[in-house]
């Protein structure tokens, strides 16, 4: 089945292209709950299956793990089926909030078939993130941070704001794997966040710890010191888990970014598929919105207002300007750049002319289709011959010397006049 996956090598494996980070972290948390632990082969098969499943993104908006499990082929290799089973069980255990009843009106109710009136919005029942859960009965798995672990975590949250779903899911996954103490969490906070964010987090954490100590925690002994000190003991696994939950909850009170949100300026390109545009919006909202902020109303509003004109016309024609996101995706599913075929204007061919060609004098073809070379416009400027161009003039060609007669060739072999030697005294010999 492959070698057991080493958790110290990379705490957060890379997600497949096109899948939001918080969805991928849910799959990772479910995979780490397997007993025995997942292998690298399991992660490879999980990525391979998710790439195939992303071709039908209906199960994402909202996410439905039962529908995703129905797309899994029978006998699929790896432990993908077990991972999906854990996600389905976790999704069923978390109670969903009931949808608010529609407001009753004393007057007549509008008909359901009116396309101008959007249907009432129903809150998604699927959880956006999974809580930190450890295998039941597992021994303490505390491991101090290493610099490569901190660098890998910081790289994952570099594009996410503190308190956003992607930031929180990454931190939850790191807490689940390393089971850090209070001192480890303080080091992680100082490494990831600025001094201002760390100060605000520290104030909120102190208030949460005071409330928890007043309320009472299982295993907490006031005579043994504050909760922060007792959570540093690796043997106090229960108190350490309580402190981890309080430390994560302190991020909920952090203020958002003061600058204009980047997701408000995301527009759909003229040739961009609609589902790719919605996925970009979804990822940007995950990175920018603080945890607990309802994302779906903002996503549905931007999915219509920031779409291109053609997709807006499709949504208006089908009455899905404020519908659930799945209906909007299905409405624009048929519109893709591949379907926009170019209309070519084909001119009918003219019949061959009956008149003779201007070049060769034969009938049955046009002069532009004639195979004869084009005649020169006038006589050659060198030799005044009207039958050829200047580039073909014989005067421009190099002249070949004529062969000499045979007698002259024989004379060339004879020596030339030999100079007579002179005496040293003077005079010829």
Swiss-Prot record:
One of its GO terms (cellular component) is viral nucleocapsid. SUPFAM superfamilies: Retroviral matrix proteins, Retrovirus capsid dimerization domain-like, Retrovirus capsid protein, N-terminal core domain, Retrovirus zinc finger-like domains. PANTHER family: ENDOGENOUS RETROVIRUS GROUP K MEMBER 24 GAG POLYPROTEIN-RELATED, IGE-BINDING PROTEIN. The modification Phosphoserine is found at residue 105. A motif (PPXY motif) lies at residues 118-121. Keywords: Capsid protein, Disulfide bond, Host-virus interaction, Lipoprotein, Metal-binding, Myristate, Phosphoprotein, Repeat, Ubl conjugation, Viral nucleoprotein, Virion, Zinc, Zinc-finger. The keyword Repeat applies. This is Gag polyprotein. A zinc finger (CCHC-type) spans 355-372, 378-395. The record marks 130-131, 344-345 as: Cleavage. GO terms for molecular function: nucleic acid binding; structural molecule activity; zinc ion binding. It comes from the Viruses. A motif (PTAP/PSAP motif) lies at residues 124-127. Coiled coil: none annotated. Residues 93-142 are annotated as: Disordered. HTLV-1 lineages are divided in four clades, A (Cosmopolitan), B (Central African group), C (Melanesian group) and D (New Central African group). A lipid is attached at residue 2 (N-myristoyl glycine). SMART domains: ZnF_C2HC. It comes from Human T-cell leukemia virus 1 (isolate Caribbea HS-35 subtype A). GO terms for biological process: viral translational frameshifting.
């Amino acid at each position: 089945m492959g070698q057991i996956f080493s958790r110290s090598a990379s705490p957060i494996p890379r997600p497949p292209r096109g899948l939001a980070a918080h969805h991928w972290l849910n799959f990772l948390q479910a995979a780490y709950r397997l007993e025995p632990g997942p292998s690298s082969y399991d992660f490879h098969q999980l990525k391979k299956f998710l790439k195939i499943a992303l071709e039908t993104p209906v199960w994402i908006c909202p996410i439905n793990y039962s529908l995703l499990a129905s797309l899994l082929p029978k006998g699929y290799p790896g432990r993908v089926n077990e991972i999906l089973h854990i996600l389905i069980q976790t999704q069923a255990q978390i109670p969903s909030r009931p949808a608010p009843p529609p407001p009753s009106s004393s007057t007549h109710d509008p008909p359901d078939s009116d396309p101008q009136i959007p249907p009432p919005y129903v809150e998604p029942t699927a959880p956006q993130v999974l809580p930190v859960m450890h295998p039941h009965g597992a021994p303490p798995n505390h491991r101090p941070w290493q610099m490569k672990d901190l660098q890998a975590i910081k790289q994952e949250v570099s594009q996410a704001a503190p308190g956003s779903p992607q930031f929180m899911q990454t931190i939850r996954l790191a807490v689940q794997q390393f089971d850090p103490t209070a001192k480890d969490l303080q080091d992680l906070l100082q490494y990831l966040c600025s001094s201002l964010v760390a100060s605000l987090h520290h104030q909120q954490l102190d208030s949460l710890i005071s409330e928890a100590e007043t309320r009472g925690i299982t295993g907490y002994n006031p005579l043994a010191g504050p909760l922060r000190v007792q959570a540093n003991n690796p043997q106090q696994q229960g108190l350490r888990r309580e402190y981890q939950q309080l430390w994560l909850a302190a991020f909920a009170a952090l203020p958002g970014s003061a600058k204009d949100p980047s997701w408000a300026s995301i527009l759909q390109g003229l040739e961009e598929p609609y589902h790719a545009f919605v996925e970009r919006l979804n990822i940007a909202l995950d990175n920018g919105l603080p945890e607990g902020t309802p994302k779906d109303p903002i996503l549905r509003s931007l999915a219509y207002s920031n779409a291109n004109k053609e997709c807006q016309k499709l949504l208006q024609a089908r009455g899905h300007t404020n519908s659930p996101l799945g209906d909007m995706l299905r409405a624009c599913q048929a519109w893709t750049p591949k379907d926009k075929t170019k209309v070519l204007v084909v001119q009918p061919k003219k019949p061959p002319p009956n008149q003779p060609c201007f070049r060769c004098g034969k009938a049955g073809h046009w002069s532009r289709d004639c195979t004869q070379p084009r005649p020169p416009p006038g006589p050659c400027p060198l030799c005044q011959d009207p039958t050829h161009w200047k580039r073909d003039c014989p005067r421009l060609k190099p002249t070949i010397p004529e062969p000499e007669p045979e007698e002259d060739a024989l004379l060339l072999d004879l020596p030339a006049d030999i100079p007579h030697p002179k005496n040293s005294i003077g005079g010829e010999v």
